[in-house]
A protein has these predicted regions:
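Inter-lobe coupling linker of SF2 helicases/translocases
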Residues: 1-123
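Short glycine-/polar-rich loops that comprise or flank the Walker A/P-loop
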Residues: 43-45, 147-150, 195-198
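Phosphate- and divalent-cation-binding pockets in alpha/beta enzyme and binding domains
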Residues: 59, 134-141, 192
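Helix N-cap/beta->alpha junction signal
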Residues: 107, 130-133
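Conserved helicase ATPase core of P-loop NTP-dependent helicases/translocases
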Residues: 126-128, 136-139, 143-187
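Conserved RecA-like helicase motor core of SF1/SF2 enzymes
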Residues: 185-206
Length: 206
């Protein structure tokens, strides 16, 4: 159990009885690997280096020094360390969550780099982000650049009754929807997005 902001959260630290679980599932399930049922081309990975803005760099250094000062001579909890790491990552993404819970935007180069990348790409694109704020920022910029009908979402704030419809729109070759933006926490598993030839990780998880 870890404590996040005064809230106790159960954390998985290991697994037990996996062989027993596997035996019980064998009677009514079978496993098929992706390469056994789909003829897919090899994946090609490409990294983009994005320079921090002066404002980002200043805030990042301030937060880093604060975290180091808190750590000196103290035993920090796992939750506290994760919170500091999360804030540093948020700053890299162009925002951070203040102590009062409000989200503060920071001038950054990510959205410009994303739009430049999209100009180079033909076909449909899946864009993953780690934070809901990032998803909403991406949606705002893509709608402005490509129109409101060009994009659908699949993340925590997407209503349950719209999620499957959004996938169908994205998968439909005649649909005007070209972009699907979501979080891997919500849409990273169990959905089919084979209409896309490109997948972009705008911000990674841990």
């Amino acid at each position: 159990t870890a404590n996040f902001g005064g809230r106790s959260v159960q954390i998985v630290v290991g697994y037990r009885n996996l062989e027993e679980l596997s035996e019980k599932l064998k009677a009514f399930s079978y496993r098929v690997l992706k390469d056994e049922c789909l003829d897919l081309p090899s994946k090609t990975y490409m990294k983009r280096i994005i320079k921090l803005t002066p404002e980002q760099e200043k805030i990042y250094k301030q937060m880093k020094h604060l975290a180091l000062a808190q750590m000196e001579g103290k035993m920090m909890t796992t939750a506290t360390v994760l919170t500091q790491l999360m804030r540093l990552q948020q700053i890299n993404c162009g925002h951070f969550t203040a102590d009062d819970g409000t989200i503060k935007p920071i001038k950054n180069n990510r959205t410009v780099e994303l739009l430049d990348t999209l100009e180079e790409i033909h076909g449909k694109v899946v864009i993953w982000a780690h934070y809901q704020y990032d998803v909403e920022t991406i949606v705002e910029h893509i709608k402005k650049e490509y129109g409101a009908n060009s994009i659908v979402t699949y993340y925590g704030k997407t209503p349950m009754n719209e999620r499957q419809d959004n996938i169908q729109k994205f998968q439909d070759p005649v649909s005007p929807v070209r972009f699907l933006v979501g979080t891997t926490q919500t849409g990273g598993y169990g959905i089919t997005l084979t209409a896309a030839s490109t997948m972009i990780y705008y911000s990674n998880g841990y």
